[in-house]
Protein backbone atom coordinates (compact mmCIF):
# COMPACT_ATOMS: atom_id res chain seq x y z
CA UNK A 1 0.00 0.00 0.00
CA UNK A 2 1.34 3.44 -0.96
CA UNK A 3 2.22 5.70 1.99
CA UNK A 4 -0.24 8.57 1.64
CA UNK A 5 -0.76 11.25 4.25
CA UNK A 6 -2.15 14.75 3.87
CA UNK A 7 -0.04 17.09 5.98
CA UNK A 8 -2.03 19.12 8.49
CA UNK A 9 -1.47 22.86 9.04
CA UNK A 10 1.33 22.75 6.48
CA UNK A 11 1.68 26.48 5.76
CA UNK A 12 1.25 27.33 9.42
CA UNK A 13 4.06 24.94 10.41
CA UNK A 14 6.46 26.27 7.79
CA UNK A 15 5.76 29.84 8.91
CA UNK A 16 6.15 28.81 12.55
CA UNK A 17 9.64 27.40 12.00
CA UNK A 18 10.92 30.68 10.54
CA UNK A 19 13.28 28.71 8.29
CA UNK A 20 16.84 29.92 7.59
CA UNK A 21 18.36 28.48 4.43
CA UNK A 22 21.54 27.35 6.19
CA UNK A 23 19.79 26.10 9.33
CA UNK A 24 19.46 22.63 10.82
CA UNK A 25 15.91 21.35 11.26
CA UNK A 26 14.45 18.25 12.88
CA UNK A 27 11.20 16.59 11.84
CA UNK A 28 10.43 14.28 14.77
CA UNK A 29 7.61 12.55 12.90
CA UNK A 30 8.81 12.29 9.32
CA UNK A 31 5.92 10.18 8.01
CA UNK A 32 5.47 10.63 4.27
CA UNK A 33 7.65 13.78 4.42
CA UNK A 34 4.80 16.20 3.71
CA UNK A 35 6.11 18.84 6.10
CA UNK A 36 9.75 17.93 5.49
CA UNK A 37 9.50 18.29 1.72
CA UNK A 38 8.51 21.92 2.27
CA UNK A 39 11.26 22.47 4.84
CA UNK A 40 14.03 21.04 2.66
CA UNK A 41 12.90 23.11 -0.36
CA UNK A 42 13.80 26.19 1.65
CA UNK A 43 17.29 25.01 2.62
CA UNK A 44 20.52 25.65 0.76
CA UNK A 45 23.21 22.99 0.44
CA UNK A 46 24.54 24.30 3.78
CA UNK A 47 21.25 23.53 5.51
CA UNK A 48 20.33 20.14 6.93
CA UNK A 49 17.22 18.15 7.79
CA UNK A 50 17.11 15.31 10.33
CA UNK A 51 14.03 13.11 10.01
CA UNK A 52 12.90 10.71 12.74
CA UNK A 53 10.35 7.93 12.37
CA UNK A 54 9.91 4.63 14.16
CA UNK A 55 7.93 3.22 11.23
CA UNK A 56 10.18 1.76 8.53
CA UNK A 57 7.40 2.08 5.93
CA UNK A 58 7.34 5.83 6.61
CA UNK A 59 11.12 6.16 6.32
CA UNK A 60 11.10 4.29 3.02
CA UNK A 61 8.34 6.52 1.64
CA UNK A 62 10.08 9.66 2.87
CA UNK A 63 13.38 8.55 1.35
CA UNK A 64 11.69 8.13 -2.02
CA UNK A 65 10.00 11.51 -1.82
CA UNK A 66 13.18 13.33 -0.76
CA UNK A 67 15.62 11.34 -2.92
CA UNK A 68 16.80 14.44 -4.80
CA UNK A 69 18.02 16.09 -1.60
CA UNK A 70 21.45 15.15 -0.27
CA UNK A 71 21.19 17.07 2.99
CA UNK A 72 18.65 14.78 4.69
CA UNK A 73 19.56 12.33 7.48
CA UNK A 74 17.06 9.55 8.23
CA UNK A 75 16.77 8.17 11.76
CA UNK A 76 14.84 4.97 12.56
CA UNK A 77 13.94 5.82 16.14
CA UNK A 78 11.23 7.21 18.34
CA UNK A 79 11.65 10.94 18.85
CA UNK A 80 12.19 10.50 22.60
CA UNK A 81 15.85 9.81 21.70
CA UNK A 82 16.24 13.24 20.06
CA UNK A 83 18.97 14.50 22.42
CA UNK A 84 21.14 11.39 22.19
CA UNK A 85 20.69 11.01 18.42
CA UNK A 86 21.62 14.63 17.73
CA UNK A 87 24.62 14.31 20.05
CA UNK A 88 25.74 11.13 18.26
CA UNK A 89 25.44 13.00 14.94
CA UNK A 90 27.73 15.71 16.31
CA UNK A 91 24.96 18.31 16.34
CA UNK A 92 25.10 20.70 19.29
CA UNK A 93 22.31 23.02 18.18
CA UNK A 94 19.40 23.10 15.75
CA UNK A 95 17.25 25.93 14.42
CA UNK A 96 13.86 24.26 14.42
CA UNK A 97 12.02 21.17 15.65
CA UNK A 98 8.66 19.97 14.35
CA UNK A 99 6.43 17.28 15.89
CA UNK A 100 3.16 16.11 14.33
CA UNK A 101 1.61 13.80 16.92
CA UNK A 102 -1.17 12.47 14.70
CA UNK A 103 -1.35 8.90 13.45
CA UNK A 104 -0.76 9.02 9.70
CA UNK A 105 -3.57 8.42 7.23
CA UNK A 106 -1.51 5.50 5.92
CA UNK A 107 -1.45 3.79 9.31
CA UNK A 108 -5.15 4.40 9.90
CA UNK A 109 -6.20 3.29 6.43
CA UNK A 110 -3.83 0.33 6.18
CA UNK A 111 -6.01 -2.29 7.87
CA UNK A 112 -3.24 -4.80 8.49
CA UNK A 113 -1.55 -2.50 11.03
CA UNK A 114 -4.47 -2.88 13.43
CA UNK A 115 -5.06 0.84 14.07
CA UNK A 116 -8.45 0.93 12.37
CA UNK A 117 -11.75 -0.07 13.96
CA UNK A 118 -13.30 -0.17 10.48
CA UNK A 119 -11.21 -3.02 9.03
CA UNK A 120 -10.45 -6.48 10.35
CA UNK A 121 -6.82 -7.19 11.24
CA UNK A 122 -4.73 -8.78 13.99
CA UNK A 123 -4.63 -6.65 17.16
CA UNK A 124 -1.34 -4.82 16.66
CA UNK A 125 -1.20 -0.98 16.72
CA UNK A 126 2.61 -0.83 16.96
CA UNK A 127 4.15 2.24 15.34
CA UNK A 128 7.47 0.42 15.44
CA UNK A 129 6.90 -3.16 14.37
CA UNK A 130 10.25 -4.21 15.81
CA UNK A 131 8.76 -3.80 19.29
CA UNK A 132 7.23 -6.98 20.70
CA UNK A 133 4.54 -5.34 22.83
CA UNK A 134 1.28 -4.92 20.91
CA UNK A 135 -2.45 -4.32 21.39
CA UNK A 136 -2.90 -8.10 21.65
CA UNK A 137 -0.95 -8.17 24.94
CA UNK A 138 -2.97 -5.31 26.40
CA UNK A 139 -6.35 -6.75 25.47
CA UNK A 140 -5.53 -10.29 26.56
CA UNK A 141 -3.24 -9.87 29.59
CA UNK A 142 -4.08 -6.59 31.34
CA UNK A 143 -6.24 -6.91 34.44
CA UNK A 144 -9.74 -5.45 34.43
CA UNK A 145 -8.48 -2.59 36.62
CA UNK A 146 -5.60 -1.83 34.23
CA UNK A 147 -7.91 -1.89 31.21
CA UNK A 148 -10.37 0.40 32.98
CA UNK A 149 -7.58 2.85 33.83
CA UNK A 150 -6.17 3.22 30.33
CA UNK A 151 -9.59 3.32 28.60
CA UNK A 152 -10.80 5.95 31.08
CA UNK A 153 -7.60 7.98 31.19
CA UNK A 154 -6.34 7.76 27.61
CA UNK A 155 -9.67 7.32 25.84
CA UNK A 156 -11.74 9.57 28.10
CA UNK A 157 -14.45 6.95 27.64
CA UNK A 158 -17.39 7.21 30.04
CA UNK A 159 -18.27 3.52 29.59
CA UNK A 160 -14.69 2.42 30.38
CA UNK A 161 -15.73 0.24 33.32
CA UNK A 162 -18.27 -1.75 31.28
CA UNK A 163 -15.89 -2.09 28.33
CA UNK A 164 -13.08 -3.40 30.56
CA UNK A 165 -15.48 -5.85 32.18
CA UNK A 166 -16.79 -7.11 28.82
CA UNK A 167 -13.25 -7.57 27.47
CA UNK A 168 -12.20 -9.67 30.47
CA UNK A 169 -15.40 -11.72 30.36
CA UNK A 170 -15.06 -12.47 26.63
CA UNK A 171 -11.39 -13.44 26.77
CA UNK A 172 -12.18 -16.08 29.40
CA UNK A 173 -13.72 -18.15 26.59
CA UNK A 174 -10.93 -17.47 24.07
CA UNK A 175 -8.27 -14.86 23.37
CA UNK A 176 -9.39 -11.77 21.48
CA UNK A 177 -7.29 -11.75 18.33
CA UNK A 178 -8.65 -9.24 15.81
CA UNK A 179 -9.78 -5.63 15.67
CA UNK A 180 -13.35 -6.43 14.67
CA UNK A 181 -13.68 -9.00 17.47
CA UNK A 182 -12.75 -6.20 19.86
CA UNK A 183 -15.13 -3.76 18.15
CA UNK A 184 -18.07 -6.14 18.67
CA UNK A 185 -17.21 -6.52 22.36
CA UNK A 186 -17.03 -2.74 22.78
CA UNK A 187 -20.36 -2.29 21.00
CA UNK A 188 -21.97 -4.86 23.28
CA UNK A 189 -20.68 -2.99 26.34
CA UNK A 190 -22.05 0.41 25.31
CA UNK A 191 -25.79 1.08 25.72
CA UNK A 192 -27.72 1.24 22.43
CA UNK A 193 -28.68 4.91 22.82
CA UNK A 194 -25.04 5.95 23.30
CA UNK A 195 -23.95 3.83 20.30
CA UNK A 196 -26.29 5.78 18.05
CA UNK A 197 -24.88 9.15 19.12
CA UNK A 198 -21.46 10.72 18.61
CA UNK A 199 -18.38 9.08 17.08
CA UNK A 200 -17.85 5.38 16.36
CA UNK A 201 -18.34 3.47 19.64
CA UNK A 202 -14.84 1.93 19.44
CA UNK A 203 -12.99 5.17 18.66
CA UNK A 204 -12.05 6.13 22.23
CA UNK A 205 -11.05 2.62 23.30
CA UNK A 206 -8.87 2.14 20.21
CA UNK A 207 -7.22 5.51 20.90
CA UNK A 208 -6.52 4.45 24.49
CA UNK A 209 -4.98 1.12 23.51
CA UNK A 210 -2.85 2.75 20.78
CA UNK A 211 -1.52 5.33 23.26
CA UNK A 212 -0.65 2.57 25.74
CA UNK A 213 1.05 0.37 23.11
CA UNK A 214 3.27 3.20 21.90
CA UNK A 215 3.68 5.04 25.24
CA UNK A 216 2.65 8.16 23.35
CA UNK A 217 1.90 10.47 26.28
CA UNK A 218 4.84 9.41 28.44
CA UNK A 219 7.42 10.62 25.95
CA UNK A 220 5.99 14.00 24.89
CA UNK A 221 7.19 16.12 27.82
CA UNK A 222 10.65 14.49 27.86
CA UNK A 223 11.06 15.11 24.13
CA UNK A 224 10.10 18.76 24.50
CA UNK A 225 12.58 19.30 27.35
CA UNK A 226 15.39 17.45 25.56
CA UNK A 227 14.61 19.19 22.27
CA UNK A 228 14.71 22.66 23.83
CA UNK A 229 18.20 21.89 25.18
CA UNK A 230 19.31 21.43 21.56
CA UNK A 231 17.57 24.53 20.17
CA UNK A 232 19.80 27.44 19.23
CA UNK A 233 18.85 30.90 20.48
CA UNK A 234 15.95 32.06 18.31
CA UNK A 235 15.22 28.48 17.25
CA UNK A 236 11.59 27.41 17.11
CA UNK A 237 9.68 24.32 18.22
CA UNK A 238 6.27 23.66 16.66
CA UNK A 239 4.01 20.82 17.82
CA UNK A 240 0.71 19.62 16.36
CA UNK A 241 -1.61 17.70 18.67
CA UNK A 242 -4.88 15.93 17.90
CA UNK A 243 -6.57 15.32 21.23
CA UNK A 244 -6.90 17.07 24.57
CA UNK A 245 -4.54 14.73 26.44
CA UNK A 246 -1.61 15.55 24.14
CA UNK A 247 -2.46 19.23 23.94
CA UNK A 248 -2.61 19.56 27.73
CA UNK A 249 0.89 18.08 28.08
CA UNK A 250 2.33 20.34 25.36
CA UNK A 251 0.58 23.44 26.73
CA UNK A 252 1.71 22.82 30.31
CA UNK A 253 5.30 21.92 29.36
CA UNK A 254 5.60 25.03 27.18
CA UNK A 255 4.12 27.12 30.00
CA UNK A 256 6.64 25.78 32.54
CA UNK A 257 9.54 26.53 30.18
CA UNK A 258 8.25 30.06 29.52
CA UNK A 259 7.40 30.82 33.15
CA UNK A 260 9.44 28.53 35.42
CA UNK A 261 9.30 30.73 38.54
CA UNK A 262 8.22 28.71 41.58
CA UNK A 263 7.95 31.63 44.00
CA UNK A 264 4.62 32.12 45.81
CA UNK A 265 2.43 34.76 44.14
CA UNK A 266 2.60 37.02 47.21
CA UNK A 267 6.40 37.41 46.84
CA UNK A 268 7.17 40.93 45.50
CA UNK A 269 10.23 39.71 43.56
CA UNK A 270 11.48 36.36 42.28
CA UNK A 271 13.96 34.64 44.61
CA UNK A 272 14.05 31.19 42.99
CA UNK A 273 16.20 32.59 40.14
CA UNK A 274 14.65 30.28 37.57
CA UNK A 275 14.78 32.06 34.23
CA UNK A 276 12.50 31.47 31.23
CA UNK A 277 14.10 29.29 28.55
CA UNK A 278 11.56 30.04 25.83
CA UNK A 279 8.84 32.48 24.88
CA UNK A 280 5.40 31.47 23.67
CA UNK A 281 4.84 32.44 20.04
CA UNK A 282 1.20 31.39 20.13
CA UNK A 283 -0.61 31.81 23.44
CA UNK A 284 -3.64 30.15 21.92
CA UNK A 285 -3.26 27.15 19.60
CA UNK A 286 -3.45 27.67 15.85
CA UNK A 287 -6.23 25.62 14.24
CA UNK A 288 -7.07 24.62 10.67
CA UNK A 289 -8.67 27.16 8.36
CA UNK A 290 -12.11 26.67 6.79
CA UNK A 291 -10.41 25.89 3.49
CA UNK A 292 -8.25 23.16 5.03
CA UNK A 293 -11.20 21.61 6.84
CA UNK A 294 -13.00 21.25 3.52
CA UNK A 295 -10.28 19.22 1.80
CA UNK A 296 -8.85 17.49 4.90
CA UNK A 297 -11.53 16.72 7.54
CA UNK A 298 -8.89 15.00 9.73
CA UNK A 299 -7.46 18.44 10.47
CA UNK A 300 -10.56 19.34 12.51
CA UNK A 301 -9.02 18.45 15.87
CA UNK A 302 -5.47 19.63 15.07
CA UNK A 303 -3.87 22.29 17.29
CA UNK A 304 -0.48 23.89 16.68
CA UNK A 305 1.57 25.42 19.51
CA UNK A 306 4.89 27.23 19.03
CA UNK A 307 7.77 28.35 21.25
CA UNK A 308 11.06 30.18 20.58
CA UNK A 309 14.31 29.62 22.47
CA UNK A 310 15.56 32.64 24.40
Curated annotation (Swiss-Prot):
An example GO biological process term is: rRNA base methylation
What Pfam families does the database record attribute to this sequence? Methyltransf_5
Q: Which of this chain's residues are annotated to bind S-adenosyl-L-methionine?
A: 33-35, 53, 83, 100, 107
Q: Which Gene3D superfamilies does the UniProt entry name for this protein?
A: Putative methyltransferase TM0872, insert domain (1.10.150.170), Vaccinia Virus protein VP39 (3.40.50.150)
Q: What is its main location?
A: cytoplasm
EC number in record: 2.1.1.199
Q: Which SUPFAM superfamilies match?
A: Putative methyltransferase TM0872, insert domain, S-adenosyl-L-methionine-dependent methyltransferases
Decide whether keyword DNA-binding is in the record: no
Residue pairs linked by disulfide bridges in the UniProt entry:
none
Q: Which UniProt keywords apply?
A: Cytoplasm, Methyltransferase, rRNA processing, S-adenosyl-L-methionine, Transferase
Q: What class of enzyme is it?
A: transferase
Query: Which reaction does this chain catalyze?
Result: cytidine(1402) in 16S rRNA + S-adenosyl-L-methionine = N(4)-methylcytidine(1402) in 16S rRNA + S-adenosyl-L-homocysteine + H(+)
Cellular component (GO) terms are: cytoplasm
Q: Which residues form a coiled coil?
A: none
Q: Where found? A: Cytoplasm
**Its job:** Specifically methylates the N4 position of cytidine in position 1402 (C1402) of 16S rRNA.
Homology family: Belongs to the methyltransferase superfamily. RsmH family.
Protein name (database record): Ribosomal RNA small subunit methyltransferase H
Q: Which organism is it from?
A: Clostridium perfringens (strain SM101 / Type A)
Amino acid sequence: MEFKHVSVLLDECINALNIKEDGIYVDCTLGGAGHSSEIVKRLSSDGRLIGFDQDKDALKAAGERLKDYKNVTYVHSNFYAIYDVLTDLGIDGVDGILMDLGVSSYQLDNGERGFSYMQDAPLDMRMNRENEFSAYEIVNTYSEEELYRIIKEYGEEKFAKRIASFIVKNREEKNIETTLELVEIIKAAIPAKARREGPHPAKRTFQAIRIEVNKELEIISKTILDGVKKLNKGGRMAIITFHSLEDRIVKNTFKELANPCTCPSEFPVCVCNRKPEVKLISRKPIEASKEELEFNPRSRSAKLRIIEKL
